[in-house]
């Protein structure tokens, strides 16, 4: 198998000026600088993961041994061209489904921290409305990911 992945386009700061739209200060208040404004540069892919899923051959076969998430992990060297990996499955003996998951370098994302709970269990969700201080940008680092379509491979009879 060969898998290739390229990261998302790095976004330029702020929003493009609009004609006929809201004034720049209003747009900034609404969007907080989160407009789609791609540059030519891409975010780095740090690793590619392969997920392997095999169907049960009999009803009492344990499922936990059939789902490997991840089954294989390939680190990706920094590259503007993205990442390319090759692999095979030397253990292939039955019908199998594979997924490829590409992981970008961690970057700040709105609500990336989920409920933002501390060790005592007290949570501080980012609702995105009056319940959250306007100065709280709700940013937290996340590793954005993309999935391939499933790859179904049948064992020849």
Which residues does each predicted region cover?
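C-terminal functional module detector
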Residues: 1-157
């Amino acid at each position: 198998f060969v898998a290739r992945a390229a990261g998302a386009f790095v976004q330029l700061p702020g929003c493009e000026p609009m004609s006929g739209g809201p004034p720049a200060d209003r747009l900034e208040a609404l969007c907080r600088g989160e407009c789609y404004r791609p540059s030519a540069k891409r975010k780095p892919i740090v690793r590619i993961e392969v997920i392997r899923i095999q169907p049960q051959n009999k009803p009492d076969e344990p499922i936990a041994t059939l789902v490997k998430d991840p089954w294989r992990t390939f680190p990706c060297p920094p590259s503007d061209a993205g990442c390319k990996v090759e692999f095979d499955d030397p253990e292939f003996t039955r019908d199998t489904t594979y997924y490829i998951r590409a992981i970008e370098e961690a970057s700040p994302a709105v609500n990336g921290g989920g409920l933002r709970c501390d060790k005592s269990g007290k949570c501080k969700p980012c609702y995105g409305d009056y319940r959250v201080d306007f100065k709280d940008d709700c940013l937290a680092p996340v590793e954005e990911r993309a999935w391939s379509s499933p790859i179904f491979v049948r064992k020849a009879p």
